[in-house]
């Protein structure tokens, strides 16, 4: 993992077309601004993990009944 230090207002580039800017730092939280093409999906990791967990629980609760054909 690459770890960088940035101050408010400073930007880093990911590839040629994604800009990540530190917008603010307050009470231990960092606010980030992200400029990226519309086809780049940006999601918070905790939401992805929550959705994956819910999908796994739903899949486990499904019961498939196999019926023999006569």
Swiss-Prot record:
Record key words, sorted: Activator, Cytoplasm, Repressor, RNA-binding, Translation regulation
InterPro entries named among the record's database cross-references: CsrA (IPR003751), CsrA_sf (IPR036107)
Keyword Repressor: yes
GO molecular function, one term: mRNA 5'-UTR binding
Location relative to the cell: Cytoplasm
GO biological process: one example: mRNA catabolic process
Any GO CC annotation of this UniProt entry: cytosol
Signal peptide: none
Family designation: Belongs to the CsrA/RsmA family.
Function: A key translational regulator that binds mRNA to regulate translation initiation and/or mRNA stability. Mediates global changes in gene expression, shifting from rapid growth to stress survival by linking envelope stress, the stringent response and the catabolite repression systems. Usually binds in the 5'-UTR; binding at or near the Shine-Dalgarno sequence prevents ribosome-binding, repressing translation, binding elsewhere in the 5'-UTR can activate translation and/or stabilize the mRNA. Its function is antagonized by small RNA(s).
Summary of subunit composition and partner proteins: Homodimer; the beta-strands of each monomer intercalate to form a hydrophobic core, while the alpha-helices form wings that extend away from the core.
Name of the protein described by the UniProt record: Translational regulator CsrA
Species of provenance: Hydrogenovibrio crunogenus (strain DSM 25203 / XCL-2) (Thiomicrospira crunogena)
Gene: csrA
